[in-house]
Amino acid sequence: RRSSDLIWLGYGVHGNESSGPNASVQVAHHLLTSTDAEVQDWLKNAVILIQPSLNPDGLERFATWANMHKGKSPVADPQSREHIEPWPNGRPNHYWFDLNRDWLPLEHPESRARIAQFYKWRPAVVGDFHEMGPNSTFFFQPGIPTRTYPLTPTANQQLTAKIADYHAAAFDKKGRLYYTE
């Protein structure tokens, strides 16, 4: 296959953003069971790789804490114990490192394994799914221009802007709140 046929969907680089890993199962189920013509076309013309948890140790730490401290009915008080995850929380990996900061240095086993697979598969599209807090609206790129890494190719920035425009139009159509900076 050509690399243009490959899509990589990665969820939960921050272990305490559990919506991503949970959603990955639903995405896989949808792709496997949908009879929608558009979905069938995707599957006919592309390989979709799903990595359900980029940070399994952080996710396990968070799940253990959440199962001990959160109830079935959420508590509105922001000072309630269910809203205050202790350190080390689920964000970092086993070594208490934020794997979202390890894409270039590749110091950790999860990152090295992920990049080895990137080099093997060479995906054309990479989805890196995060979760916002319960009191936040949605964020999507391109974000603040001064935070753009100087060696990021212009074509990447242009594609990111097109994707952002697509999301903005969809959110505007539904009246959903979001921010990009």
Residue ranges and their predicted role:
Residues 49, 63-64, 68-181:
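Metallocarboxypeptidase
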Residues 7-11, 98-100:
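Short glycine-rich or small-residue beta-strand-to-loop segments that form or flank ligand, phosphate
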Residues 23-67:
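Short helix-loop-beta-strand segments that form the rim/entrance of peptidase-like active sites
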Residues 17, 21-25, 111:
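Short alpha-helical patches at coil-to-helix transitions and adjacent helical residues
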Residues 6-7, 48:
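Conserved hydrophobic helix-helix packing surfaces used for dimerization/oligomerization
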Residues 13-18, 54-59, 104-106, 131-135:
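Solvent-exposed loop/turn segments at secondary-structure junctions
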Residues 2-3:
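Short, small-residue-biased leader/transition segments that mark boundaries at the very start
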